[in-house]
Amino acid sequence: MTPQAFYQVLIEHGITLTDKQKKQFETYFRLLVEWNEKINLTAITDKEEVYLKHFYDSIAPILQGYIDNSPLSILDIGAGAGFPSIPMKILYPEIDITIIDSLNKRINFLNILANELELSGVHFFHGRAEDFGQDRVFRAKFDIVTARAVAKMQVLAELTIPFLKVNGRLIALKAAAAEEELISAEKALKTLFSQVTVNKNYKLPNGDDRNITIVSKKKETPNKYPRKAGTPNKKPL
């Protein structure tokens, strides 16, 4: 997907990028490739692949109408090089983005990226989701949590749901259909007082399969969740 094809798809969805936004995506691509030489950020470095499999893929929740350009508080868990939240922030500057990542080198990259892109309303924290999920500053404070190819729902639910306000939404993006995964996650979702409201398969413009799952939080999370770092992965609910 060339940058021009990317812009055209957005126009077809009613979004026309300004010159500033186009430049932000261009700078994002350049910094991603430069920094990838120093730290492992992505296996995808070809320009057209980055625009398709990182930029376009990241904005799926916007293109499908699940996020609008309003002062939503969004937490991105395990964003790596900033996906999906930074492309969404470029598109919709009104949203407020927080990223938690367990690798400090990636946080350093994100700080430089945000500075170069002149983004405001972005916050980056180094650490484990399990630890932040028990911190009152972060717990039950977000409208939306996003996670792109982070973990199976059975594990992901415990890492993300505690951060949501009641009626907040987890938006999980994956490469493959998630039917079996959701069956395995039924107990975890019930324990965390949350339920699946959307589970939708779609395709990228090149035909690759993708899946978006949205989980809504119905009641406050029991205090004991998330359990200590590493436990959700080793002993899923």
Swiss-Prot record:
Alphabetized HAMAP family for the sequence: 16SrRNA_methyltr_G
User: Which top class of enzyme applies to this chain?
Assistant: transferase
Asked if the Swiss-Prot or TrEMBL record annotates the protein with the keyword rRNA-binding, the reply is no
Query: In the record, what terms sit under GO molecular function?
Result: rRNA (guanine-N7-)-methyltransferase activity
Its domain of life?
A: Bacteria
Protein's name according to its UniProt entry: Ribosomal RNA small subunit methyltransferase G
For the ligand (S-adenosyl-L-methionine), the binding residues are G78, F83, A129, E130, R148
Write the lineage as a comma-separated list. Bacteria, Bacillati, Bacillota, Bacilli, Lactobacillales
- The leader peptide range reads none
Membrane-spanning regions, if any?
none
User: For the region Disordered, what residue ranges are annotated?
Assistant: 216-237
